[in-house]
Amino acid sequence: MASFKNNGKLKLLIIVGTRPEIIRLAAVINKCREYFDCLLAHTGQNYDYNLNGVFFKDLKLADPDVYMEAVGNDLGETMGNIIAKSYQLMVEVKPDAVLVLGDTNSCLSVIGAKRLHIPIFHMEAGNRCKDECLPEETNRRIVDIISDVNMAYSEHARRYLADTGLPKERTYVTGSPMAEVLHNNLAEIEASDIHKRLGLEKGKYILLSAHREENIDTEKNFLSLFNAINKMAEKYDMPILYSCHPRSRKRIQDSGFKLDARVIQHEPLGFHDYNCLQMNAFCVVSDSGTLPEESSFFTSVGHPFPAVCIRTSTERPEALDKGCFVLSGIDTVGLLQSVDVAVSLIRDGLPGIPVPDYVDENVSTKVVRIIQSYVGVVNKMVWRKF
């Protein structure tokens, strides 16, 4: 079992479990390792190498110190394992604080920290899409309420937290950590030879990512979206490179749905390759929550791309405020119209305005300072330890 070095520094346990958490936390993890006695624990929620391992390599991250192997036979068992194994880990290593990001099931690990009176710091706090059907929306509410210090990306998110009655004095706006990660990797992104390897011509393909539970697991939504994708292939008559998660691939296979021949299913791509493809796509069509942040960043560095989000809601309204992407829904008419508009706006020199909270490149430093500042405050004011 891994343990802290006990070198006199604050002992911080960071818990991750999915690709988005690893990507967004990359700069924060490395910064925390500089200034804290830090352990990185992985729940195993995403266990495929291309969904996980390749990103540690791309982002120059040391491997996790602890693998919990929490995946069970079904969702209930997995969620139970995440909570139970995280609790046991905290009992054994005795961290001074726990840091999580986002809204995944892995974030539910903080339930154990709360019962153990360990200060909890939550990044990406306050995000709300106002769609109660989404499991992430439930997780957001749970983790925001449990956390002792919430670190939001934007004033929209801070306002949502305040509206739920959470203490304003323990809520901060740090901005999104994505710009720092993208900036640190921009040279490698621009140098990627992924187009040569895949035989794609820049500007002559559509990049597709569709993996969200509401789009893949719900029959009506699945058929609506993938029929729309086939129509998109017919209309634009160019390759559609589908960065396809194992779950999505299995769903397509099990359903017997026949994709248009121009839709190329590809295993999930590495961080540098995927972002190079985004920068040079005719259009990016994705249900990823990171799309608005990536679109904003690449606009800020002079590489705007047409971005279409295949969802009916967004937890990043600040990106719509600045016109960084188009929200299309999952029907054929909405998707085709949205691609037309997104592509035409970029062609006409109207890429939108970078979101100020999405282009801040010192988020990791802010997080270090907030954690160091508030562990003692939480112990005194919340848990009355001294």
Q: Where are the regions that the model predicts?
A:
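Nucleotide-activated sugar donor-binding and catalytic core shared by glycosyltransferases
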Residues: 1-238, 248-386
